[in-house]
Amino acid sequence: DDQTLAVCVSSVNFISGPQTLELDTLMPLCQKVGAQLFVDAYLSVNVQHFSLEEYNLQQAFVAAGGAKYCQMGNGNCFMHVPPGRDFRPIITGWFGCFDPLLDSPASRPVAYSDDATRFNGSSYDAMPHFRAVHVLDFFRERKLSVDFLADVNHRQLELLAKRFKALDVPESQIQLPVDVEYMGGFMALKTPFAQSLCEKMRDRGVHTDYRKHWLRFGPAPYLCDEQLE
């Protein structure tokens, strides 16, 4: 309603794993009531077919990180800032590019850059950025495009789902409630024994993790079918 200031969603539920469906319908609804839209795309970038244009998110704030699927390690994050957003940062630093000579609607008492750099903070360790450059070069050299990685991930999820269904385990014990078509980059099984199963599998050299009653399997492009099975 018109009391809503912002809508914050994730492109993928990080606990149970399904994609957020109809993500492309949110921006018009937010614009209708004057609310800002923020999307956490961390679990979509570099593992799914995800683009601002496809999901109608050019006017939304969209953030993601370099760890996990981007393979950049910790310390890298990035955000798409819609053009023309001149909000004043609450937490800032000299990387916010403030300049008293800028002719900006937000120029008093301190003027910030007119572009997305106004949301930069204070001094930070820039080494992860250099690491990210080498990672991106590696991806290009090996022709590891987003489309290729997304296709590999989808096929791996299909394999995991097929192997699980073949076990024919009672749904009262463990179940797969999300079809592969609607999964994010990982498969999550719902079970009251998530923690104990995760620990027992780790003892056998199978690395998974769990969130509450969800046991999560995250395939990677460097794993072959035999390893997944």
Task: Report each predicted region and the residues it spans.
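Active-site PLP attachment segment
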Residues: 56-108
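PLP-dependent enzyme catalytic core of the Aspartate aminotransferase-like
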Residues: 195-229
